[in-house]
Amino acid sequence: EHADVKRMLLAQKAYAEGALALQLYCARLVDEQHTGDEAAQKDAALLLDVLTPIAKSWPSEWCLEGNSLAIQVHGGYGYTRDFPVEQYWRDQRLNMIHEGTHGIQALDLLGRKVTMDGGAGLKLLASRISATTERAGHVEGFATHANALAAALQSLGAATKAAWATGVPE
């Protein structure tokens, strides 16, 4: 009924479902490391190495934002013990600490995982994303989103190159 409440609820849904999808994809990669042919196992290991710091930091940050929105949706009542969202917020805030600080995860990703094996993991991830955007670009209603994702991938590549331009990504 209220547009702003609807926006906050949809954002929470997107954060939670996106985090779950990322975790399930990583779980699938764990399984694929031990099944299939040797090339598929190697690809799964490379992708998992690149995605692990992201899988640790992204959900902890954005699901905390989702919890903050839940408190807002409750009009502040969620910050009291009337609703469990205040406990969820505290628990979620600890996830950012338990999974390692975002700075540590960023250094791991940019300092080690991106350059590992000559950048093979990031190149494989980029090729998978590109293949997905190519397929999605031909599906009615998805082209705009596919183009946005392709542009974001280009920006990621440029940002990664810029970070490494000095030789030390800090």
How should these model regions be labeled?
Residues E1-E170:
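Flavin-dependent oxidoreductase catalytic core characteristic
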